[in-house]
């Protein structure tokens, strides 16, 4: 990094450094972040120290692995800075997870499990991620390790890896995500919609948790997710022999999401411009009531979940012929294009995962402890937020220059926007600029 860029980084890190207290920690934090941003094939402690400060390896290792400082305070500052940069009603909060392939069995949380990035089972660690995003600019603000069952059942193994006592109980990925959302809400981060794939959307407790927090959401679901027509009614069944019924039952049977949209009207839409032109797919949407109420036996039909809250059921038919299904609690008056654009905004978190790994070494940490892994992940997120702040500043500077030519237009020439208007054009973002050499 140049002297000017190093100074710029140090200034940007000032609110983070203020929370670290001790001067040694305030010196190691910028050094670690600079190592992540700078050139080099490996972004673990030893090679970063060798490149930047050969005499500081022990201090840098101590800072990330065992130093006494509260990472929760820096996580809060990261959320505050991300909100300052892109928070608002047009911003989305994307829930996902990412896998870090590993060899051996001693690194915290490592186990054979499904790795979404690889599309198969692999020996890896899985981190639940929260990404704040607006237009084409994502900022990751949360990475929390998921502990598989074979770790939860081994207290000695967890103790050896330094897993905190309050993190040793079994928690599903959706439960971890809800806890992280609570942390983000406590930091007053502003966003309009929560997005998640079917790994989270199939969880009724996750959707109910979002509802309980008063959040707007759009989530993927499997094609067999059961729903009811929106006009379903609860009625008393006709009494037969035996005891009379004490509970209402739905007057219609639930259907799979796939079957519910079989006769729906599909429209081909473009939700945003890609590098090769408009991105298009066919979409259909109907209002339904989700079958996630209490289970009840209904005659010879067996157990069925009762109708729950009303929501949008959305189908996507891709050019390849593949179909995807979603549920969303957006208002009933929202149009199909807005639904499609909202759902498809989730893609940007995959870009963030890739950049944190390829550019900043998220998966390069060589330690085995809970604390070290989460601190390394936190430093990569802080480095990523810094780089995104530079991208945003560069893009906003260009936008201001373009606006000068339109300064003479009257206010009356500008159309008013409704609350749920079609998504505005994305700010044209320059590429992420690390100091790593390009392949």
Q: What is each stretch, according to the model?
A:
Residues 1-20:
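Basic, low-complexity segments
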Residues 10, 119, 133-162, 166-169, ...:
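An anionic, glycine-rich sequence signature occurring as long contiguous blocks
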Residues 20-26, 31-105, 112, 218, ...:
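Electropositive nucleic-acid engagement tracts
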Residues 48-49, 89-103, 130, 193-202, ...:
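Short, conserved catalytic/metal-binding motifs centered on acidic residues
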Residues 65-149, 154, 159-160, 295-302:
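Active-site-proximal, Lys/Arg-enriched surface segment
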Residues 77-82, 163-192:
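Short, basic/hydrophobic alpha-helical segments
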Residues 186, 206-216:
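Short, surface-exposed basic-aromatic patches at helix termini and helix-loop junctions that form
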Residues 205, 328, 335-343, 358-375, ...:
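Short, solvent-exposed helix-loop connector elements
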């Amino acid at each position: 990094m140049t002297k000017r860029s190093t100074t710029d980084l140090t200034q940007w890190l000032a609110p983070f450094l203020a929370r670290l207290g001790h001067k040694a920690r305030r010196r190691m934090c910028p050094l670690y972040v600079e190592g992540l941003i700078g050139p080099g094939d490996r972004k673990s402690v030893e090679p970063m120290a060798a490149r930047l400060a050969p005499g500081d390896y022990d201090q840098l290792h101590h800072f990330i692995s065992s130093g006494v400082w509260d990472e929760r305070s820096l996580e809060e500052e990261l959320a505050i800075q991300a909100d300052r940069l892109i928070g608002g009603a047009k911003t989305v909060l994307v829930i996902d997870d990412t896998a870090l392939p590993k060899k051996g069995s001693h690194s915290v949380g490592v186990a054979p499990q499904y790795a979404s990035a690889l599309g198969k089972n692999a020996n890896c660690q899985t981190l639940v991620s929260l990404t704040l995003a607006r237009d084409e600019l994502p900022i990751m603000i949360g990475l929390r390790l998921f502990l598989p069952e074979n770790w939860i059942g081994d207290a000695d193994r967890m103790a050896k890896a330094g897993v905190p006592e309050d993190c040793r109980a079994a928690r599903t990925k959706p439960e971890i995500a809800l806890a992280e959302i609570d942390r983000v809400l406590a930091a007053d981060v502003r966003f309009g919609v929560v997005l998640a794939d079917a790994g989270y959307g199939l969880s009724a407790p996750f959707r109910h948790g979002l509802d309980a927090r008063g959040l707007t959401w759009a989530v993927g679901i499997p094609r067999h997710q059961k729903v009811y027509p929106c006009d379903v009614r609860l009625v008393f069944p006709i009494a037969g022999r035996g005891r009379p019924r004490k509970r209402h039952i739905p007057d219609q049977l639930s259907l799979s999401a796939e079957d519910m949209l079989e006769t729906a009207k599909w429209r081909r839409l473009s939700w945003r411009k890609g590098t090769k032109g408009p991105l298009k797919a066919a979409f259909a949407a109907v209002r339904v009531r989700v079958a996630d109420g209490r289970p009840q036996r209904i005659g010879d039909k067996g157990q069925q979940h009762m109708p729950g809250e009303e929501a949008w059921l959305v189908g996507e038919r891709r050019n390849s012929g593949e179909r995807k299904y979603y549920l969303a609690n957006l208002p009933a008056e929202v149009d199909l294009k807005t639904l499609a654009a909202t759902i498809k905004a989730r893609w940007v978190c995959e870009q963030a995962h890739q950049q944190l790994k390829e550019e900043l070494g998220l998966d390069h940490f060589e330690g085995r402890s809970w604390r070290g892994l989460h601190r390394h992940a936190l430093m990569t997120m802080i480095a990523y937020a810094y780089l995104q702040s530079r991208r945003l500043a560069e893009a906003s500077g260009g936008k201001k220059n373009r606006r000068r030519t339109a300064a003479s237009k009257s206010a009356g020439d500008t159309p008013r926007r409704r609350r749920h208007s079609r998504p505005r054009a994305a700010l044209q973002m320059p590429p992420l600029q690390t100091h790593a050499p390009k392949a």
